[in-house]
Amino acid sequence: MRIVYAVFMLLLVTFGAVVMSLEILSSNLMSPYFGGSIYIWGSIISSFMVHFSVGYVLGGYLSRRLPRLSVLAALLVVGSLWVILIPAFYRPVCELIADRIADVRLGSLTAMNLIFFVPVSIMAMVSPYIIGITAVGNRPSWLTAGMVLFISTVGSFFGTNVTAFFLIGLFPVSRIIAGLGLIGLAVSLFTLALRPDRRIAK
């Protein structure tokens, strides 16, 4: 079971970091098409809040209906692949929306949700899903819901600051986003390879 708990922490830290890194980077994707005003940041923050909320609800629901870590890992594979593809499709999406919608507030909201809704909602499922899985059966006394959220928040802290303070100055944004997707994909496939459901059942 120690391996399973280590995987829990790996998932929490990794995807806590990835989602916040994506939030920081999204401003660089939006600004060439919708500007860099407070409206854009309002769109970014509110969109990610909606995505988080959807992920929390779905994660909690699926953890009760399908309490298997392999299900979560498979969903994270989908979310990670989506992130890898963002550099390939965000430009035509933003160009189309900017041409069709004159209001930058509505335009940026639309673009944010089309580009980020699926992967961020999936990645936001990690914390509630793990809380739901650990609520079934015996778990160590330290692995409380509060500890799960704390570990995820530590990942978010590092994802935010490493991206803002270092990565943006070193690499093109598209390359960073693709790298985040590859990291998420590697962690998800590693989780599947460990066959975590069999380990949890023991």
Q: Predicted segments — roles?
A:
Residues 1-202:
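Alpha-helical transmembrane segments of multi-pass membrane proteins
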